[in-house]
């Protein structure tokens, strides 16, 4: 599963793990990605989205209908 949020577009960040002796090793900071299923009344079906924790909060605030409308407008496959 790709570590990209469908709503916010959050992608992994890159940086270093720094040990006690300050040796730096490359690492990846992944967003908190979850698969969530929502029922969308206008489509009359369930929609499964790959979301970050912030993306889930956006859906809670704006509503699934508004978010799905935006996703369809920008050509996202649902």
From Swiss-Prot:
One of its GO terms (cellular component) is ribonucleoprotein complex. GO terms for biological process: translation. Pfam families: Ribosomal_L28. Keywords: Ribonucleoprotein, Ribosomal protein. One of its GO terms (molecular function) is structural constituent of ribosome. It comes from the Bacteria. The keyword rRNA processing does not apply. Coiled coil: none annotated. Belongs to the bacterial ribosomal protein bL28 family. This is Large ribosomal subunit protein bL28.
């Amino acid at each position: 599963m790709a570590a990209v949020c469908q709503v916010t577009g959050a992608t992994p960040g890159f940086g270093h793990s720094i040990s006690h002796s300050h040796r730096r090793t490359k690492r990846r900071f992944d967003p908190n990605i979850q698969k969530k299923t929502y029922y969308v009344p206008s489509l009359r079906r369930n929609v499964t989205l790959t979301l970050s924790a912030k993306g889930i909060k956006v859906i809670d605030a704006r509503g699934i209908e508004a978010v799905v409308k935006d996703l369809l407008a920008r050509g996202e496959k649902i």
